[in-house]
Amino acid sequence: MSREPLLEIKGLRLDFNQEGKSVEAVRGADLKVFEGEILGLVGESGSGKSVTALSITGLLPKAATVRSGSIRFDGMDLLGMPEEDLRKIRGAKISYVFQDPATSLNPVFTIGEQIIEAVTLHQKAAGAGAFDIAVSSLKDVGMPSPEEMMHAYPHQLSGGMRQRAMIAMAVSCRPKLLIADEPTTALDVTVQAQILELLVKLKRDMGLTVILITHDLSIVSQVAEKTAVMQQGMIVEYGDTELVYRKPSHPYTMKLIDCIPKMGKL
């Protein structure tokens, strides 16, 4: 008996209206994500990766319009869901981590205040209970001195620590799905590896399902069980990561692999 996917996107078509002209950004995308796995969504800038991810919970800009398709998550039809119900899904069941935590975190509030806000909203915890959940979330992501970090402001943290804080906020409500959109791009190589290891750890310890969005196929090959390759708004290849990496079937995937630096070649 085959497993049902946690998230399934079918025939998604989405366009942007620019100065009276319609520009198609996603052209019939199909995607399945199964519970407890990391799926790498790979493609160059402008291929439609991020806008596909944002469409899952209706976080699209006003200029964007979903023309057709379906998005089902945990048995629920997200495209047909009222905004009020979608708000209950965001953060509680589906969380996002974006590329630059410096712009995602509010500079005038402490890390603790921002995590507590999410916990209070989605878990209905308050006071000492919300504080304890926030501290526990910082511990989960390997933040040193989590009690002290609760009182730190974003500008007082390094890039890697800010990203850990963002991930802590994202997992504080124990979502089923974490969408990480280029979470390592703004980080140096050493910190990048630490964040990737953290995503694998959270998947293992929490049973988290992860969509890892990146332009770098080498990153996906390190952590993801499945890989979907996106080009010009379409999923052109999907399968087990090892098979996609070792025996790509689409010319675009082959080109992405050719872009990966290899030892002994300049």
Please identify what each model-predicted range represents.
Residues 66-77:
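Conserved ABC transporter NBD signature motif
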Residues 193-206, 218:
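Helical segment within the ABC ATPase nucleotide-binding domain
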Residues 235-239, 247:
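ABC ATPase "signature
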